[in-house]
């Protein structure tokens, strides 16, 4: 069976840059699934993409499906023929439907009987017959939220499609995709390359676009070129480029032939907090800021052009003219905002709703202040600073700078607070209240900042759950999942001795009678436990391990973490599996008991040496374990409990638990209950 590389390319108008990678990856994934479904053999599916095209190269694709022998079983022989050996209507009808006579049918003999059988050879379809439908199906499944129509066609896609190329080796596959017929024409760069290129063979694709089209169609190669060029230019300016991965991805999706250039701006703008300048460079202009070796902003920026200009200085000047008004705006906002203190802006928060049923941002700030003060007291942070930071936490939202550049909220609060003469710890908390912003982000550095960040997240969680608007499915408009995970990360990583139920109760208290959900405390705590499960599972812990701890519902995250780590290490012991099995057996026995089980073991009722031995060991262990439990030293406790493996085995081998004498039976159940409760003080190892 012959093999060739297959090229599929859609030439489009400019695709949304923030969606380009996802579209290309989804296209490749969908085509791969369709090829497997069609049972076509291939080595790999590689995606390529630029602003004006989506493309795939399928390596070593077979030219057709394999031929198949299809077997169709008919009626059983004893049903197919009557007593005289004549074919019945059932047999005749089956044969007719398969285009044969009964006499032409073969026989299938198994240990269960004998049946009529028809075998036919089905020729595999060719790539030319299959690929148009495969590609169409793959395109139909792309994640496109807002498709558009163009021209007079009813066809919809994310952007208008102008060319389609499906090339199997040198052979053009005829067909249409999105209303456009397959052709050998591909388009070069809009300004630098040839408008139309004729491609003769799939293997020419990248080279042809590189040489004649001035398009680097390999996304990852283009991205690497941009990174290298930006870093080299920054080094030439005695600096380091501030390269965000998300910005690099977006810029890669905006250009087909990257040319990096460096521009500059006046030193006076460096008096403005660098975060505001960096924000406008990155977010508004898609520029890469340049920092010195100490991380301070230099009056330079690097941008990526999509053309090779005969006069680069003109291009640089044009970009400098574009950025200068943005920087001037930031300078103006900064100077204007400093004329009013953050404290003086608190009252203006009364005009901004946090949520219709939950009141204004001023009310939210007051709640945050109260909760932050309470948390600070518990974690031995400065309560006055925590209360003050909580009260001022949202005031920078009313500044011109934050209204213009929303992403600098918090950081501008810090700068304005320092200008106002607020305590440094208060100012830092205003910046760090939003941490962590995303998975893997840094955490607040001070205890005051931790208190404010926790208070803010608790207020949002309790408020939204309290009015019955918990997240449903993927929808999470208030980012409650992120808030919950951030809350748990702060408490766990900072080793804060805080109880979730107590925290939620404190936050609930601040709302007075605003909340309508009577079960809000339980609902929020359950939501937090669910985030425990998801977070630890993502970190590689097994579902069983996490569940063993969740059964105990330890409401202190630090306690939860210590239990989880202890059980994880316990699982590595050779005694772990038999002890888990024994706990499961004990759990099943105790679950069937009707009525209460004695809390104490009566030594006078012990008869068998194995039960005497186990009871004595349990008594000794209880004394040993008590200080370990008090110190949350669950790891040492489980190592001690591992010593029960042998005496428990002896007990089950030599002792009849369900004895005929009710008193002896009850006493033996009490031994098992006592043993089970020792383990349950840490986790339910029976689920391991």
Swiss-Prot record:
Gene Ontology annotations of biological process type: arginyl-tRNA aminoacylation; glycyl-tRNA aminoacylation
Listed PANTHER family: GLYCINE--TRNA LIGASE, CHLOROPLASTIC_MITOCHONDRIAL 2, GLYCYL-TRNA SYNTHETASE
Enzyme class: ligase
InterPro entries per UniProt: DALR_anticod-bd (IPR008909), Gly-tRNA-synth_bsu (IPR015944), Gly-tRNA-synth_heterodimer (IPR006194)
GO cellular component, one term: cytosol
Keywords associated with the record: Aminoacyl-tRNA synthetase, ATP-binding, Cytoplasm, Ligase, Nucleotide-binding, Protein biosynthesis
Annotated catalysed reactions: tRNA(Gly) + glycine + ATP = glycyl-tRNA(Gly) + AMP + diphosphate
Cited SMART domains: DALR_1 (SM00836)
Protein family according to the UniProt entry: Belongs to the class-II aminoacyl-tRNA synthetase family.
Name of the protein in question: Glycine--tRNA ligase beta subunit
EC number: 6.1.1.14
Keyword Ligase included in the entry's annotation: yes
Subcellular location: Cytoplasm
Subunit structure and binding partners: Tetramer of two alpha and two beta subunits.
Domain of life: Bacteria
Gene: glyS
NCBIfam families: glyS
A molecular function GO annotation: arginine-tRNA ligase activity
């Amino acid at each position: 069976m012959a093999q060739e590389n297959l090229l599929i390319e859609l030439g489009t108008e400019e695709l949304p840059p923030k969606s380009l990678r996802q579209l290309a990856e989804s296209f490749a994934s969908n085509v791969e699934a369709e090829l497997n479904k069609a049972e076509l053999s291939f080595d790999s599916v590689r995606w390529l993409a630029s602003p004006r095209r989506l493309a795939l190269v399928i390596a070593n694709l077979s030219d057709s499906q394999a031929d198949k022998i299809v077997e169709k079983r008919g009626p059983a022989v004893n049903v197919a023929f009557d007593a005289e050996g004549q074919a019945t209507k059932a047999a005749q009808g089956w044969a007719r439907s398969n285009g044969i006579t009964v006499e032409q049918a073969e026989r299938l003999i198994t240990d269960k009987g004998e049946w009529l059988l028809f075998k036919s050879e089905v020729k595999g379809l060719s790539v030319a017959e299959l690929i148009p439908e495969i590609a169409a199906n793959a395109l139909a499944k792309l994640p496109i939220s807002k498709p558009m129509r163009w021209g007079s066609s009813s066809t919809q896609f994310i952007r208008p499609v102008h060319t389609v190329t499906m090339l199997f080796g040198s052979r053009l596959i005829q067909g249409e995709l999105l209303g456009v017929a397959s052709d050998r024409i591909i388009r070069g760069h809009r300004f630098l390359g040839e408008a139309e290129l004729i491609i003769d063979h799939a293997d020419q694709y990248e080279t042809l676009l590189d040489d004649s089209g001035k398009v680097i169609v390999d996304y990852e190669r283009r991205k690497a070129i941009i990174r290298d060029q930006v870093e080299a230019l920054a080094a030439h300016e005695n600096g380091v480029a501030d390269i965000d991965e998300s910005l690099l991805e977006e810029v890669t999706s905006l250009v087909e032939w990257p040319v990096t250039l460096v521009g500059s701006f006046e030193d006076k703008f460096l008096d403005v907090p660098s975060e505001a300048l960096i924000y406008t460079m990155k977010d508004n202009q898609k520029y890469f800021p340049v920092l010195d070796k100490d991380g301070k902003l230099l009056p330079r920026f690097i941008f990526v052009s999509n053309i090779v200009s005969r006069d680069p200085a003109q291009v640089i000047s044009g970009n400098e003219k574009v950025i200068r008004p943005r920087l001037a705006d930031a300078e103006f906002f900064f100077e204007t905002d400093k004329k009013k203190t953050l404290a003086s802006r608190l009252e203006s928060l009364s005009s901004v709703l946090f949520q219709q049923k939950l009141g204004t941002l001023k009310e939210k700030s007051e709640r945050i202040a109260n909760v932050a003060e309470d948390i600070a007291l518990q974690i031995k942070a400065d309560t006055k600073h925590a209360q003050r930071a909580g009260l001022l936490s949202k005031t920078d939202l009313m500044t011109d700078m934050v209204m213009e550049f929303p992403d600098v909220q918090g950081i501008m609060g810090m700068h304005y607070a320092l200008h106002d003469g607020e305590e440094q710890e208060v100012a830092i908390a205003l910046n760090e209240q939003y941490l962590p912003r995303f998975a893997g982000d840094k955490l607040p550095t001070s205890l005051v900042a931790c208190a404010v960040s926790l208070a803010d997240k608790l207020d949002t969680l309790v408020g939204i759950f309290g009015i019955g608007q918990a997240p449903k499915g993927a929808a999470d408009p208030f980012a409650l999942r992120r808030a919950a995970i951030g809350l748990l990360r702060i408490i766990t990583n900072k080793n804060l001795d805080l109880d979730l139920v107590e925290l939620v109760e404190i936050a609930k208290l601040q709302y007075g009678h605003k909340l309508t959900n009577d079960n809000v405390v339980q609902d929020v705590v359950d939501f937090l436990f669910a985030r425990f499960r998801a977070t630890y599972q993502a970190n590689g812990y097994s579902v069983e391990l996490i569940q063993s701890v969740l059964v105990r519902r330890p409401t202190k995250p630090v306690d939860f973490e210590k239990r989880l780590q202890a059980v994880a290490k316990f699982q590595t012991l050779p005694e772990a599996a038999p002890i888990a099995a024994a706990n499961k057996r004990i759990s099943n026995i105790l679950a069937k008991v009707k009525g209460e089980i004695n809390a104490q073991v009566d030594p006078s009722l012990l008869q068998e040496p194995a039960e005497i031995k186990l009871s004595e060991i349990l008594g000794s262990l209880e004394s040993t374990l008590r200080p370990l439990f008090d110190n949350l030293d669950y790891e040492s406790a489980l190592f001690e409990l591992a010593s029960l493996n042998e005496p428990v085995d002896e007990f089950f081998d030599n002792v009849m638990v369900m004895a005929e004498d009710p008193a002896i039976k009850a006493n033996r159940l009490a031994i098992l209950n006592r043993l089970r409760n020792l383990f349950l003080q840490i986790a339910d190892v029976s689920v391991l």
